[in-house]
Amino acid sequence: MRVVFFGTPEFALPSLQILLQPQSPFEVVGLVCQPDRPQGRGQKVLPPPTKVLAQAHGIPVWQPVRLRRDPQVLAALEALAADVFVVVAYGQILPLTVLQMPKLGCVNVHGSLLPAYRGAAPIQWAIANGETETGVTTMLMDEGMDTGAILLQAKLPIGPEQTSLELAPQLAQLGAELLVETLLKLEKGELTPIPQDGSRATYAPLLKKQDFHLDWQRPAQALHNQIRAFSPNCFTGIEGQRIKIVRSASPQLHSPPPEIPQGSPGEVVGLARGEGIYVATGEGSLLIRRAQLPGKKEQSAWDLVNGGQLKVGMRFEPLPNS
């Protein structure tokens, strides 16, 4: 089976790797990914991980800025005469001309149980909303945003303290395994695509800065879900400076001892020896385990207590213009 792979970030790597295994029944004849972009603190221009892997296997790579407006890439894709296009976190919408090229269509691996969490950030929003289960879906793509007919699905539990950074590799691997099963069954005509029920659709939009701002008036459980969903980016203010809250403990598993007062939202109301600090919220208290001060490395909240940067009675507050 001749495959063109569309995918850019780490999430796409397991799917590409599984197609490239020795004795694989799949022949990857091309890769399409996003252009090389500046990354990290140093803003060094780096290639996408899928490009590095493809080039190591001698696979031709295309990196159009706008696929639908690049006639040379479109012509090259047509000439490859692929049986199927596989799309995993590519980062651009495929135009109808591309969707219609391969004989078996375009198969997408999406990191949710569609029609739930259509969009760019399904893993993060599933955690932020307190889901206890998610999964991956393979679908036949159409022109909509994650609206294509469902081929196969596989479920995965979400742990009460699991972060999106921990969940993503598990979903990526599960998606790779589901992709192989999907392609083999699709080639044999053993799959019946099931249209999505649009009335049950939910959405997972691109993340924005305001999604990372912690509002201590919210319940402890909601804040915990936000922190682990968007880690390590959530932030708040303390004594006029920004502090990132990187890791918290599940309020269901770590309730404060009875001697710790309730306090007002944002107030540091107690210490958990060797672990961190308890912060009052709009409903209950939240144990903060790891944090990061400006210009410093991430460290345990208990180390910040020992260093005098965090104390009982201090208050986390909104930052101006945050």
UniProtKB/Swiss-Prot annotation:
GO molecular function terms attached to this record: methionyl-tRNA formyltransferase activity
Superkingdom is: Bacteria
SUPFAM superfamilies under this entry? FMT C-terminal domain-like, Formyltransferase
Native species:
Synechococcus sp. (strain JA-2-3B'a(2-13)) (Cyanobacteria bacterium Yellowstone B-Prime)
Substrates-to-products reaction catalysed: L-methionyl-tRNA(fMet) + (6R)-10-formyltetrahydrofolate = N-formyl-L-methionyl-tRNA(fMet) + (6S)-5,6,7,8-tetrahydrofolate + H(+)
Amino-acid positions noted as binding (6S)-5,6,7,8-tetrahydrofolate in the UniProt annotation, renumbered to this chain: 112-115
Listed A to Z, the keywords are: Protein biosynthesis, Transferase
- A Pfam short name: Formyl_trans_C
**What does this gene product do?**
Attaches a formyl group to the free amino group of methionyl-tRNA(fMet). The formyl group appears to play a dual role in the initiator identity of N-formylmethionyl-tRNA by promoting its recognition by IF2 and preventing the misappropriation of this tRNA by the elongation apparatus.
PANTHER family found in the cross-reference section: METHIONYL-TRNA FORMYLTRANSFERASE (PTHR11138), METHIONYL-TRNA FORMYLTRANSFERASE, MITOCHONDRIAL (PTHR11138:SF5)
Query: What's the name of the protein?
Result: Methionyl-tRNA formyltransferase
Q: What family is reported?
A: Belongs to the Fmt family.
CC per GO annotation? cytosol
Xref: HAMAP family: Formyl_trans (MF_00182)
List the InterPro entries hit by this protein, alphabetically.
Fmt, Formyl_trans_C, Formyl_transf_N, Formyl_transf_N_sf, Formyl_transferase-like_C_sf, GART_AS, Met-tRNA-FMT_C, Met-tRNA-FMT_N
What EC number(s) are associated with this protein in UniProt?
Answer: 2.1.2.9
